[in-house]
Amino acid sequence: MKFFRLIIPCAALMLFALPMAAQKPEQQEKQMMEFIDKEVKRLTDVLGLEYWQEFYVDSTLTHDYHAMSDELQKLQSAKVENTDLYITIRDKWMQQIDDTYKRIFTEEQWKKYWKSGAQRAQKERDKRKK
């Protein structure tokens, strides 16, 4: 169950990141911000984030998801069909988010986050790197 709490946001991100090129920019932005807001709320509820941590999580997700989306759109615009490249970009940005979370969260929050599925996601990213 905990695994799905992490995988569902990642899957949702991929569901809106790849078909974004067919949407209007306003729709893309709205959809991304709704996703980010839900993820911040989820992390706040699960980890008991303080206000300043919520701010940093929101800022991190906003920056990194936009950057990841831009990279994915560039690949899509170039008509790249190699799915491994899309996965590599997603993994790079998810690793960046986890690295930032580790600096933001307390040790207790990090352990809780790590056990809630982040550790499994990290192992999967590590497998794909090999």
Task: Kindly give the residue locations of the regions a language model identified.
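Bacterial Sec-dependent N-terminal signal peptides
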Residues: 1-27
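Charge-rich (acidic/polar
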Residues: 23-130
